[in-house]
Amino acid sequence: MSILFSGDFHANSRDELKLITKKTLINKYQKAEYDEIKYHIILGDAGFLWPGNEKTDLFNYKALANRPFPVLCVMGNHEPILGMSDVPEVNIGIGEKVLQINDNPFVAYLKRGGIYKIENHRFLVLGGALSIDKEFRRPNISWWKREYWDEAEKVNLFLLLQKHKKFDYVLSHTGPNRINRIVNTYKTPGITLKFFDEVAVLNEEIDERITCKQWFCGHWHTDKYYYDENQRRGYQYLYEKTALLKNDEIIVL
């Protein structure tokens, strides 16, 4: 069985749904490979539960329900769930619990700082990022302070990493700071790009403490891959492309 990865979804606000429909995925990977997909992981900014967006969520859920596999989401920065404290936690047999937001299709968020065992792969799950446009957003309506990790989360993470340093893959929203600078030249008209992102700096510190085969992330609205000779691993950024992980083979289309 395999795992599908995709980048920012934004509740389909930029027509991202067309990138992950059943038809698109079969055209990309062929029916035999599509039938092997066990989970779909969105690498942050899934954008579900946006205030006033209930009809859009229902539309997206209906489209995603045409596919037979559950959706698991990394925490991004444009995520209403960051401001919620009453989301049910459920155990689906992949290690840490997940935060379930929908039944059919099954949609849930992975916990930041969690270790998950999915299809025999060991994942460290991170999340969050700087909202470069937060000056134009409203606190707790379109921007949430918890896009940054709080001190307790960081302390718990580093305690975890004292015991666990070896992973198969890392999943985050933004990448490590130095890799972001190498790979991305993302610019938005009218918005000053702020390169100092506490989450990206945190990711870089984590990157220096662990070993893994590859790092997957989104956030930058680009599809790029960078291999770091010093760390001896790759960093895959996704947006319009998707990645399929089967055993340890990765197909990006």
Question: PLM features: what roles do these ranges have?
Answer:
Residues 1-4, 114-125, 169, 229-236:
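Beta-strand-turn-beta hairpins that frame and shape the catalytic cleft
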Residues 5-8, 40-45, 70-78, 109-111, ...:
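Active-site neighborhood of phospho(di)ester-bond hydrolases with catalytic His/Asp-centered motifs
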Residues 6, 12-118, 192-203:
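Core catalytic region of metal-dependent phosphoesterases/phosphodiesterases
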Residues 10-16, 47-52, 77-85, 116, ...:
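Active-site environment of divalent metal-dependent phosphoester hydrolases
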Residues 48, 60-61, 68, 168-217:
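Cap/insert and terminal regions of metallo-dependent hydrolase folds
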Residues 69-71, 89-94, 105-110, 123, ...:
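Active-site regions of enzymes building and remodeling cell-envelope glycoconjugates
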Residues 117, 204-209, 220-253:
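Binuclear metal-dependent phosphoesterase catalytic core
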Residues 119-197:
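Active-site-proximal loop/helix segment associated with metal-binding centers of metalloenzymes
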